[in-house]
Design a protein with these regions (language model features):
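Catalytic-core elements of nucleic-acid end-processing and repair enzymes
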Residues: 1-175
Length: 175
């Protein structure tokens, strides 16, 4: 667990924000040069409430794309990607902040959220199995030649409910 001082640093450094419109998501994908705006998959998941697109920003530059997040209803982070689908050198600090953010989100879940989460997890697992069975490989960039399912599973930040309930978390994190 992070010390209180460390969590305060992360709270001052980052914020998670929701896009105001589809145009925000399209701009994010164009600016960071990744796939969030190049496929209907993410928009279909938003409509079905399987997952959502959120943006991680540095507080000092809230309008500048930093990381794009794909997040399930319970705060499980499926993907966190910076420019060109990479993760920057600061990924450990980013991941620490996102873990704190997840704990805050999980404290606020309703019964309806929890039910949506079960369906979202099931769909994610089915998708991972499907792309693994088809041996879907990344074709370009840093991860060329790697199995997509392996990359997605490695990026997954799934915080067990028990962990969220039993550990201390900061009182304020932008949601």
């Amino acid at each position: 667990a992070l010390s209180s001082a460390a969590s305060d640093v992360y709270k001052r450094q980052y914020q998670v924000i929701a896009p105001k419109s589809i145009d925000d998501i399209l701009y994010e994908g164009d600016t960071l040069h990744h796939c969030v705006n190049k496929t209907d998959t993410y928009f279909d998941r938003i409509v079905s409430k399987e997952s959502y697109i959120l943006f991680l920003r540095e507080k000092e530059n809230p309008k500048v794309p930093f990381y794009t997040l794909e997040v399930e209803p319970d705060g499980t982070i499926r993907q966190k990607r910076a420019e060109f689908n990479r993760q920057n050198k600061d990924i450990d600090k980013v991941t620490s902040f996102l873990t704190l953010w997840q704990k805050e989100i999980q404290k606020r879940l309703t019964q309806k959220d929890r039910k949506s989460t079960e369906e979202s997890r099931k769909l994610r697992q089915q998708n991972y199995q499907e792309i693994r069975d088809k041996h879907v490989v990344v074709h370009g960039g840093t991860f060329a030649g790697e199995l997509l399912a392996d990359l997605l599973e490695k990026d997954l930040m799934d915080l067990p409910m028990e962990s969220a309930e039993n550990e201390e978390s900061p009182t304020e994190i932008a949601a």
